[in-house]
Amino acid sequence: MLHYAVVFFVIALIAALFGFGGIAASAVSIGKILFIVFAILAVASFLFGLIKKR
């Protein structure tokens, strides 16, 4: 459990550096594009799973 706490603390520090450093503003557009791509892939995977069961 302590291992997970340390890992999430390090991730939070890295996110804070990006957020306070101004890098986050330029990464927003990349994040939006990646969200759309992975949402489409998730829906496609779900549909292919339903089709394959039949």
Curated annotation (Swiss-Prot):
Pfam families assigned: DUF1328
Keywords: Cell membrane, Membrane, Transmembrane, Transmembrane helix
Key word Heme present: no
Ranges annotated as spanning the membrane: 5-25, 30-50
Record's bilayer topology term: Multi-pass membrane protein
Locations listed in the record: Cell membrane
GO cellular component, as recorded: plasma membrane
Keyword Repeat: no
HAMAP family hit by this protein: UPF0391 (MF_01361)
Record-linked NCBIfam families: PRK13682.1-1 (NF010226), PRK13682.1-4 (NF010229)
UniProt similarity note: Belongs to the UPF0391 family.
Protein name as annotated: UPF0391 membrane protein Rfer_1875
Organism of origin: Albidiferax ferrireducens (strain ATCC BAA-621 / DSM 15236 / T118)
Lineage per the UniProt record: Bacteria, Pseudomonadati, Pseudomonadota, Betaproteobacteria, Burkholderiales
